[in-house]
């Protein structure tokens, strides 16, 4: 009896994990990052394509991961062509470069936290291949991560931008009172992300 109860518990747990919801946020009128997000909006507005192949995504992530990490500007991402030419950038720069290279009009540029305990903001890309959402973080990873497989306390989105909108994610409900007061840069000088 106990082995079948254990088997049933494992089956239920795996089904719950398989049904994990990806936080795509709700439409936001404004964010604390609005004064700094112009390069992101310009790049996203220029995207015309649709979902590239997974092989192309993996190749781009590997290329972006090979760019040297250097924190330059705390809030504003470098234009993708600057990051490509220098082969250097922080998480914002690499994420925006990746958005541009993907040329997928449905991609999302995300600002959030790597984990609940982090104080420094991080940037990455959310991408849908037509079947599911993926976390693309070429600052820290060589390969895409299925968004529904990310641990509950990791890759916590706060705000995201797409060609068609700006989104606030559930963790920001506690941040709304201080929305105009944030001084947290996206990436931090001296904190090297391998």
Locate each region found by the language model.
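Bacterial N-terminal signal peptides that target proteins for export
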Residues: 1-8
């Amino acid at each position: 009896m106990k082995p079948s109860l254990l088997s049933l518990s494992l089956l239920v747990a795996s089904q719950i994990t398989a049904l994990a919801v990806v936080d795509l946020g709700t439409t936001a009128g404004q964010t604390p990052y609005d004064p700094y997000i112009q390069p992101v909006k310009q790049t996203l507005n220029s995207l015309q394509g649709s979902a590239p192949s997974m092989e192309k995504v993996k190749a781009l992530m590997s290329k972006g991961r090979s760019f040297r990490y250097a924190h330059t500007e705390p809030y504003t991402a470098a234009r993708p062509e600057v990051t490509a030419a220098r082969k250097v950038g922080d998480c914002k720069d690499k994420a925006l470069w990746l958005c541009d290279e993907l040329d997928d009009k449905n991609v999302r540029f995300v600002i959030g936290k790597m984990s609940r305990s982090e104080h420094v903001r991080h940037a990455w890309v959310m991408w849908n291949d037509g079947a599911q959402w993926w976390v693309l973080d070429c600052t820290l990873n060589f390969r895409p991560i299925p968004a529904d497989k990310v641990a509950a306390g990791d890759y916590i989105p706060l705000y995201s931008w797409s060609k068609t909108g700006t989104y606030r994610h559930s963790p920001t409900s506690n941040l709304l009172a201080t929305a105009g007061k944030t001084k947290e840069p996206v990436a931090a000088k001296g904190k090297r992300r391998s």
